[in-house]
Amino acid sequence: DGQRVLAEAGRQDTGHFRAREAFNELRINLQYMNPDDPPRIITVTSTSPADGKSTVAANLAIALVRAGVPAVLVDADLRRPTVATTFGLPAGAGLSDVVVGRASFVDVLHESADPQGLVILPAGQLPPNPTELLTSARFKEAIEALAETHMVIVDAPPLLAVPDASVVATRLDGALLVLDAESTTRDELRHAVQALQRVHAPILGAVLNRVDSKDR
């Protein structure tokens, strides 16, 4: 479907030298995509829930921080959040609570110890109406406030499961589409791209995940 592949990541995604290099390559490609006005707020999404989008989002945020770029990882997958669990954060308030006015950033932002400097905004209390929350002006305002001082990586829902991801992408600088090298079909890719194009969401490119090292 003509999508530019910005990086290929193998099956082993944590601590592995080759994986670290892949996400560093992704960081560089994104930062130099438009040197005069690089994307500040990036939606990371996928066709299906198990394609590895949350792993890619987390590793991209980590790569940015390791390169000296202040970054915030935001869990906007309000139906199936994983960021808090991945980073060992306690259950509590997060993005949804900020958007509805129950909490402020000072209450919900967490700073990672490893890597030091990565800021994490978990999903928070799961709302009954995720789509309405993610299409609200307050969601956009919250993300833009974070982007004043940090690059923002938004872990969004999968495109073909719910409408949330394509809606989120319209409000941010662009979407990064994660594809599973082992399972994503051409039809799924086509439908995902069409979902983004229907709402005029900019597509930054694709990440091919779970690539067998023998195939590289």
Predicted regions and their residues:
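Switch II (G3) loop of P-loop NTPases
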Residues: 71-74, 94-100, 105, 120-167
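Conserved Switch II/interswitch segment of TRAFAC-class P-loop GTPases
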Residues: 155-161, 172-190
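Short boundary/hinge segments that flank catalytic cores
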Residues: 1-70, 76-96, 102, 106-107, ...
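Short, structured coil segments at secondary-structure junctions
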Residues: 171-172, 199
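Short, well-ordered coil/turn residues at beta-beta hairpins
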Residues: 46, 122, 155-156, 178, ...
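Short, flexible helix-loop junctions that flank or precede catalytic/ligand sites
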Residues: 111-112
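Short, conserved active-site loop motifs that form the nucleotide-linked donor/cofactor pocket
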Residues: 117-118, 204
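Hydrophobic anchor at the start of a short beta-strand
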Residues: 71, 152, 175, 203-204
